[in-house]
Amino acid sequence: MIDLHIHTTCSDGTDTVLELLKKAEEKKLEYISITDHDTCKGYDQLKETKIDDIFHGKIIPGIEIKCSYLKRTIEILGYKVDTDKMNELMRNFYKDKSRENLQKKYFDLLYDKCLKMELTLTKKEEIIWNPKNDWASFTIYSDLKKYESNQTKMPADMWADFSGFNRKYCANPNHVLYIDKSEDYPSLSEAINMIKEAGGLVFLPHLFIYKWVENPKEFINEIVENYPIDGIECYYNSFTEEQTKYLIELCNKKKLYKSGGSDYHGLNKEKIQLGTGYGDLKIPEDIIQEWI
């Protein structure tokens, strides 16, 4: 069993790198990749760790980069990157706009937009969060959920889960909650170039979760046809069998590599388990043999 999409406390996960390795060993995972958001700092910790004493599988160096595409934010995965080089490239890009400052800005903007919708929130100064690691949108959503009165003021899919709130509404230019982040993140081309410069392979993750996309297959093909993509995440925690089958067939047709991952975040997405997602995710090891 493998899991190539995992987050730790180096970004927005709740497991430390060591805790993650212990869980991976308990689950008998054969391959893992720590793909923290916009950083490879977790791999710095691994350099100081006797990995063989904790985890007997193999680790593929990875990263997940948020980038802008068509005035929206999407993510790409980088595998087999030089982690030192990747960290250097990310530092250089964000040198004048730290993650902490960006999240503080988004928090203030989103908080005010929610008030315009006449939604109830805790006083801004009383909301406890850490902009160095936490996402402003998740923090706001979690606070909105504390007040049942908000349910009658929010569309059902906005209230139901964070993915709907974030990817359908906060990412929708036609909705009051929209925040244009396109200037704050690298473009898709820039993000791809950084991964390539760090010697890595570029994969497209969770392609069916972008709820603002009206035609997912058209969206996927546009990126595949116009950008130097190496592979696609074909197995993901929320994919249907039909979606996985479509992506596998696309990879075969376009001669792209395949991968899969749970998008594990620990307690921040407590229903998603390492290796198995919602419990039924089974990623065959043989899909990665041609590129590892």
Which positions does each model-derived feature cover?
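Mid-to-C-terminal alpha-helical segments outside catalytic/metal-binding sites
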Residues: L267, T276, L281-I292
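Surface-exposed, active-site-proximal loop segments in enzymatic domains
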Residues: Q273
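An N-terminally biased module of ancient metal coordination in phosphate/nucleic-acid-related enzymes
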Residues: M1-R72, Y178-K269, Q289
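Short acidic/His/Gly/Ser-rich catalytic and metal-binding motifs that mark active-site loops
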Residues: M86-N87, N268-E270
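Extended substrate/RNA-proximal surfaces in nucleic-acid metabolism proteins
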Residues: I51-E218
